[in-house]
């Protein structure tokens, strides 16, 4: 079963078995504007929750992408390097940034549900 959760830093995490796929939310890509460059983490890199591990640059600004959970990067989405505009078109689907194995599966459950994330956005 696939579940999706969200961070207050505007990343989404889709958990499928033991693999977590991470990307930025539609809200984040909308705030950034047209994305022109993406820097992805290296495969095999261990990241801590809250650690800056990727960069997304737009015509407006550059922003760090934070690891919403601790774990090891197992794959980066190389398609984003060739077509960073995918982030704008497919923020919460095909434009994932990286996949990782989690250090602690229970930490996933502590992230925001879709309803909680929408409520959080309403406070911004």
From Swiss-Prot:
Choose one Gene Ontology CC annotation of this protein and give it.
glycine cleavage complex
- Domain Lipoyl-binding residues, every copy: 19-101
Which PROSITE patterns does the record match to this protein? BIOTINYL_LIPOYL, LIPOYL
N6-lipoyllysine: residues carrying this PTM = 60
List, alphabetically, the InterPro entries matched.
2-oxoA_DH_lipoyl-BS (IPR003016), Biotin_lipoyl (IPR000089), GCV_H (IPR002930), GCV_H/Fam206 (IPR033753), GCV_H_sub (IPR017453), Single_hybrid_motif (IPR011053)
Q: Which cofactor does it need?
A: (R)-lipoate
Keywords for this protein: Lipoyl
One example of a Gene Ontology biological process annotation: glycine decarboxylation via glycine cleavage system
Co-factor note (free text): Binds 1 lipoyl cofactor covalently.
Q: Which domain of life is it from?
A: Bacteria
Gene3D superfamilies, from UniProt?
Answer: 2.40.50.100
The entry sums up its family as follows:
Belongs to the GcvH family.
Fetch the NCBIfam families from UniProt.
gcvH (TIGR00527), PRK01202.1 (NF002270)
Subunit (UniProt):
The glycine cleavage system is composed of four proteins: P, T, L and H.
Q: What is this protein called?
A: Glycine cleavage system H protein
Gene from which the chain derives: gcvH
């Amino acid at each position: 079963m696939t579940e999706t959760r969200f961070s207050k830093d505007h990343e989404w995490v889709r958990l499928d078995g033991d693999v977590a796929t991470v990307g930025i939310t539609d809200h984040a890509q909308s705030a950034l504007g047209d994305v022109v460059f993406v820097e992805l983490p290296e495969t095999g890199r261990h990241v801590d929750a809250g650690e800056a591990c990727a960069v997304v640059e737009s015509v407006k600004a550059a922003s760090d992408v934070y690891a919403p959970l601790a774990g090891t990067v197992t794959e980066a989405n190389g398609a984003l390097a060739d077509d960073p505009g995918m982030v704008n078109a497919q923020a919460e689907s095909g434009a994932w940034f990286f996949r990782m194995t989690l250090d602690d599966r229970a930490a996933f459950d502590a992230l925001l549900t879709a309803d909680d994330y929408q409520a959080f956005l309403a406070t911004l």
